[in-house]
Amino acid sequence: MGTKLSVSLEGASTPETAPRVDRPPTFDPQYGFERPRKVREMKATWEEMEQWKLKPAQRDYCAHHLISLMKCQTQNAPFAGHACDGERGAWDKCEYDDHIMRIKEFERERRLLQRQARKEATA
């Protein structure tokens, strides 16, 4: 529950080792991995997202699941709540997995910045 507060306090006390969330990662995404990591790709096109009028916050790697949920809801209205459980579950799981992946990337960046600071301090 206090993650946001602890991250912001850590960023204020040691800004050189706190990752910036408004900028791309400073380290190579493949650094430290034996095999290359799979590059994430958008499955929904910009045209589909425009057609379904997705908000900017909804245009993420899970947009294709949201579009299929919205299609199901329009086809099964007014009983879409029960008919679209599978699509809703797929979208929720994708959003959860995306959130976990972003947290892991943030933690990886933070640890690499701390490691870099330790190396510079000893050199």
From Swiss-Prot:
What PROSITE patterns does the annotation carry? CHCH (PS51808)
Q: Report motif location: Cx9C motif 2.
A: 84-94
GO terms for CC? mitochondrial inner membrane; mitochondrial intermembrane space; respiratory chain complex I
**Designated name of the protein:** NADH dehydrogenase [ubiquinone] 1 beta subcomplex subunit 7
Q: Which UniProt key words apply to this protein?
A: Disulfide bond, Electron transport, Membrane, Mitochondrion, Mitochondrion inner membrane, Respiratory chain, Transport
Give compartment(s): Mitochondrion; Mitochondrion inner membrane; Mitochondrion intermembrane space
Q: Which family does it belong to?
A: Belongs to the complex I NDUFB7 subunit family.
Quaternary structure and partners: Complex I is composed of 45 different subunits.
What are the disulfide bonds?
A: 62-94, 72-84
Q: Where is this motif: Cx9C motif 1?
A: 62-72
Q: Do you know which Pfam families this protein is assigned to? A: NDUF_B7
All residue ranges annotated as the CHCH domain in the record: 59-102
InterPro entries, per database record: NDUB7
Q: What is the documented function of this protein? A: Accessory subunit of the mitochondrial membrane respiratory chain NADH dehydrogenase (Complex I), that is believed not to be involved in catalysis. Complex I functions in the transfer of electrons from NADH to the respiratory chain. The immediate electron acceptor for the enzyme is believed to be ubiquinone.
Main subcellular localization, coarse class? mitochondrion
| UniProt comment concerning the protein's domains | Contains two C-X9-C motifs that are predicted to form a helix-coil-helix structure, permitting the formation of intramolecular disulfide bonds.
Q: Where is this region: Disordered?
A: 1-32
Describe its membrane topology: Peripheral membrane protein
